A protein has these predicted regions:
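Conserved alpha/beta-hydrolase "acid-adjacent" motif
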Residues: 122, 147-153
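Active-site nucleophile elbow and catalytic-triad environment of alpha/beta-hydrolase enzymes
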Residues: 113-130
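Catalytic histidine neighborhood in serine/cysteine hydrolases
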Residues: 151-173
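Short helix immediately C-terminal to the catalytic nucleophile in hydrolase catalytic domains
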Residues: 2-6, 18
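A catalytic-pocket lid/entrance helix-loop region that shapes and gates access to the active site
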Residues: 11-63
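Small-residue-rich helix-loop
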Residues: 97-104
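Short beta-strand/loop motif that positions the catalytic acidic residue
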Residues: 133-134, 140-142, 146
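Accessory cap/linker subdomain of secreted extracellular hydrolases
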Residues: 61, 65-97
Length: 173
């Protein structure tokens, strides 16, 4: 969101410090929904097997439908599966971490809503418009082992930004 804001209002921004780079692209969303589980197969299995077999073809819309359902007995378990999957994949320590209650619901609904709406940006919006903020200093900090936001995205952003961007990869993160 910081990047989208800076591109929309460059006159209000003096620089950016960014971490865990996510550009809101369809490949990044697909990575989260379909490919990230290669590194966390147990968490992915729980995430996907919660859905009926027929609903697994379009994981995003299946979860989105459940998460936006008014009935707590429908949206809350879906939210907890979504949030637990994400938090399980966000650590170097193996093992599922349960996220429950309003925290799970807030995280899952917000992310699914953004993902279902292409993060409210045209394809590749950030990189295509980086010229608007290229003059600003940017410090990009990225975990080398970040599975949710892989370092390749931070590299792509730093290269597109040019000389005013510094990229620091943190080896143990």
């Amino acid at each position: 969101l910081a990047l989208a804001y800076a591109i929309a209002h460059p006159e209000r921004v003096t620089g950016l410090v960014l971490r865990g780079i996510f550009l809101g692209t369809r490949p990044e969303v697909d990575w989260f929904l379909y490919d990230m589980g290669r590194f966390f197969p147990e968490a992915y299995k729980e995430f996907v097997e919660y859905l009926a077999r027929d609903d697994r073809e379009d994981i995003l819309m299946s979860y989105h439908d459940k998460l936006t359902n008014d009935q707590t007995l429908v949206h809350q378990p879906a939210a907890e599966r979504w949030a637990s999957y994400e938090t399980s994949c966000s650590t170097l320590r193996a093992g599922a971490r349960r996220v429950t209650g309003r925290s799970a619901l807030s995280m899952a609904r917000l992310e699914a809503h953004y993902f279902a709406n292409d993060c409210f940006m045209p394809p590749d919006h950030i990189i295509s418009n980086i010229r608007v903020i290229r003059h600003l200093p940017a410090h990009i900090i990225q975990g080398r082992h970040d599975v949710i936001c892989p370092p390749v995205t931070a590299h792509r952003l730093a290269e597109a930004w040019g000389r005013n961007a510094t990229l620091r990869l943190v080896d143990d993160a």
